[in-house]
A protein has these predicted regions:
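A short, flexible loop at the N-terminus of ABC-type nucleotide-binding domains that lies
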Residues: 4-17, 22-33, 82-85, 99
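Helix-to-loop junction immediately C-terminal to a conserved catalytic motif
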Residues: 62
Length: 173
């Protein structure tokens, strides 16, 4: 018997949004009263017209933005950067910004390894020495997106599509 299927939907959620609204200023509401559960182990696509709030919704979901009203919970916890469990939960949320956010003059591999930083809790060792298992994972992901052979190439030397795949690989870290 699969016990997971007998649990209430909210028990399976990694992200819960309850009556969330968001705005960038006091005048213009971008999102209004959004409620949703993002279930663990599932993939979602957010589709909408330009300016409809897709990026804003993603920023709310991964803790990059605080809602104007309502609450966003991660594994049933309110955002708290001092809480170790919260930081672990939020580090599992991949996000590919529209501008990609690649670090110029660094290699493809280094850009992908940036995705491991929230888990490592040690930003001081940024490019010095990543654990061997993180480097192996990065190579596996680069292989998955067809870029492992270019792992040492500088990102500014890549095509637009290759840069997008580097950003996807980083989100998968």
């Amino acid at each position: 018997m699969n016990m997971e299927n007998t649990l209430p939907i909210s028990t399976l959620s990694i992200i819960q949004m309850r009556d969330v609204s968001a705005s960038y200023d006091s005048e213009n509401l971008i999102l209004k009263n959004i409620s949703m559960n993002v279930k663990r182990g599932t993939n979602y696509a957010i589709v909408g017209a330009s300016g409809s709030g897709k990026s804003t919704l993603l920023k709310l979901m991964n803790g990059m933005m605080i809602p104007s009203s309502g609450v966003v919970l991660y594994n049933y916890q309110k955002p708290d950067l001092k809480n170790k469990e919260y930081k672990k939960s939020i580090a599992k949320i991949g996000y590919i910004p529209q501008t990609l956010g690649l670090v110029k003059n660094t290699s493809v591999l280094e850009n992908v390894l940036i995705g491991a930083l929230p888990r490592l809790n040690n930003l001081k060792s940024f490019f010095k020495m990543f654990p061997k298992e993180e480097i192996e994972k990065a190579h596996d992901i680069l292989d998955l997106v067809g870029l492992d052979a270019k792992s040492e190439r500088k990102v500014h030397m890549l095509s637009g599509g290759e840069k997008r795949r580097v950003a996807i690989a980083r989100a998968l870290m």
